[in-house]
Amino acid sequence: EKVIVVGHSSAGHVLQMALPKVADKVEKVIFNNAWLLPDNKSQFDFVPDEIKSVMRQAAIESGTGAIPIDPQFVRHMLASEASDELYEELMTFLVEQPLIIMETPVQAKAFAEMKIPMVLLYCTKDVSVPPGAFLGMFKAWGDNPVVEVDCDHEGLFTAPEVYTEGLIKAINL
């Protein structure tokens, strides 16, 4: 039986490389404010140098090769709509992100050749990237449907009802 895959944020470019390997098992992919990258580009190719250097240094200092969670970035860029209580709870779930995810160029040719339906679940209050950036990344891969939801980058956590309604709509397209 086929599955519907949902990828959020940096999982977008992870899925770009993984999905072609299991394309026969996937009915649809829903990207949620996900980084969808051109072939042979990494997420860091789209991040300002001053931010990259801070992230790389933090990963070195962590001793794990992972970028530690920046509470201020989460609060003001990812979970900008969360109450203080929700923000504190979210912080208990988040984990460091391996630097390699940010630095590895995506091999996206096989992804471009896939014939799997795609939908963007687009969180319209996301301020983690410039306005329209995630929409532009998605539309670069074709004229696929977009479902807008009125929430921030962490909408699944900060506005679960609104997010779930949008997700169900995306599933049913």
Question: What are these model-derived regions, one by one?
Answer:
Residues 3-9, 123:
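Conserved alpha/beta-hydrolase "nucleophile elbow" surrounding the catalytic nucleophile
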Residues 124-157, 169-170:
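Conserved loop-alpha-helix segment in the C-terminal half of the alpha/beta-hydrolase fold
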Residues 69-81:
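Helix-loop "lid/cap" segments that line or gate small-molecule binding pockets
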Residues 7-17:
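Glycine-rich nucleophile elbow surrounding the catalytic serine of serine-hydrolase chemistry
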Residues 114, 120-122:
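Short beta-strand/loop motif that positions the catalytic acidic residue
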